[in-house]
Amino acid sequence: MKRFFAFLLIGALLFTACAAQTANAEKQPATAAPASTQAAASQESTPTAALTDPTDAARETTDAFSITTDNGAVSASGSVYTITAAGEYTIGGALSDGQIVVDAGEEDEVKLLLNNASITCTTDAPILVKNAGEVTVKTEKNTYNTVSDLRTGGASAASEENYDAAIYAACDLKLTGSGTLIVTSTYDNGVKSKDDLSVKNMTLKVTAVGNALKGNDSVEIKSGALMLTSTASDGIKTENTDVSSKGNQRGTVTISGGQVDIYAACDAIHAAYNVEISDEESCIVNLYTTSYASESTAAAGTEQYLIVPSSLYSEDYEYYVYLYNEDDAAGAWVKCTYDTMVYSGRTAYYGLAYRTSGSYQNLLWNLVPAGTAPDGTNYVAASTGETVNGSMNAYLITSISSGVIAGDWVQLSSGSGNSNKTTYSAKGIKAANEILITGGAISVYAMDDGLHANGGDALENGAAGLGNVTISGGTLSITSADDGIHADGALTIDDGTVAVVDSHEGLEGNVITINGGAISVYGDDDGINACSGSATPLLTINGGSLTVTTPSGDTDAIDSNGNFSMTGGAVLVRGGTQMGNMAGSVDVDGSITVSGGTIAAFGGICQIPSNGSVNTYVSNGTSFAAGDYQLKDASGNVLFSFTLDTGYSSCWIALEAFVLGSSYTLEKDGTIVLNWTQSSNTEGATGNYGGFGGKGGFGGHGGWGGRR
């Protein structure tokens, strides 16, 4: 579940159009050093090598098709083979335009053993599980198997009988085995379970128009080599957020091992509840969205929205769109599903999403009782047919009167954030509650936020999404067109290596806490931004090694709409060049309190640590050229070392090791640049460094940004 905030201009809901552009590839990340006397050092960060495409047409079987079992029950009707009992079924050979159907008992466990099988279908899901307790699809050792859904026209959600995946299961589905499975869907999803979906050991390649992997209740990847491509939707997706009868929370995506490479037109991982990544089995995750995903097509124009005033929305009714052409050929009914909240000023609207292939020129809307499949006559209200407006991405219902739906086309956009980001959601990892990373090697290339946790939206379990991101281990490298890591709630880094290589705003959250880890951040607006939310904005650094870099000009390396507190760690700030206003090295609305650790802040001076902080030295007007620096005491002991990659003319340094009456030097490549005796709590240049503080809410300059 997601939340949009929009502006009402000239009678239309506007979401600013944003062209996807490749991020500046010349910016290099910094990898932090663990020593408390050393700042994070700049170095190139590269992802783990992508998987080799396992597709091998020469291995695809042309043998005669067979399905055998010793303890089950299977029948054939033409090229459709139906399994009706628990057991193991070995499937091999080529089944052209055929289908494997499982329609067994509620508690039956069915295993499909793929032994060099090739299954294609142009009319339905090639592997369809209508009913069973649990189904396992296993690839036998060293075998090569393909499942191809060759239906055309795009999926319709008009009824429960829409089996919208190449491998579709109405029950728990497990994919396992030490062979290879190639899944292709030109229709919609690649592999889908209405319940839980898990993958273990298998070499799996999925290419789909819709989601590559979808488990309505959960998706779990334990091991294997997975190459997942969605050319017009998400890579991995979950849908439900309620609690099962056994007390299990639904909606989580879990990755604990193997290598997972995802290429997605929209979000690489989209969880209705949590995303949890650990390193139980050498976990590697490489994520690419939109223009970074070479096989994806532009998603703009494929996902459309129906905007419904809250007074015209009820869970007792459902909206459908009928897409058709004037040639009298059969059209398609598509269900409009809740996707987001849209706000115009203080007016709330429900944003319902539907997907169209773009091949239809006309549409009409139907409102039907919940659970009813529309047929064009059983509606409560309907619109007259009209032409699709290809230049707009949403239709706003303005009234329903005497059974007639009326409205107009509008354009949705985020209205804030980076203009290089996409107009639709194209995040690396997105969760409606929390993102929890305890291990693994994770690389993200996203034309939107790298990691994003939504907060505040109502979940089906009765709670509101927390919007938290917690990193306690692993290695992350993030290149993003908007925020590197965004948390509507709390962003906490306890350990691990985090490199935000390129971003609009590097780390953004309501409450940001850094307890440890090796962290480097580059943001072309703010490096770190503690911004408005449900709690008072706060940035706290208790430990770790951190380097934050922003380009010269109107930028803040550290920006807090509240306070900034530091009790430990080593921090190097390389910020904007303006001073005494809204840009610089550290810019806060409240106060800066440094009670421990080391921080050197280069760039425009907006604020300095408050009285009662550790001793601070301030320099204004000194030339600090690019190079390697060491801060030493009178005995020559190195207290702090760091590197500047460009020149600065002002800085402040706060250090718990500064002692009143003691002398210190700052040396560049062995040459003294500064020397002083610390005779007071604040030594060196003085002045009123007040400043205006933070730049507004999430995503940019003034108010909440459009976040999906």
Feature map (PLM): residue ranges:
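A composition-driven surface/loop motif
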Residues: 4-14, 18-300, 414-708
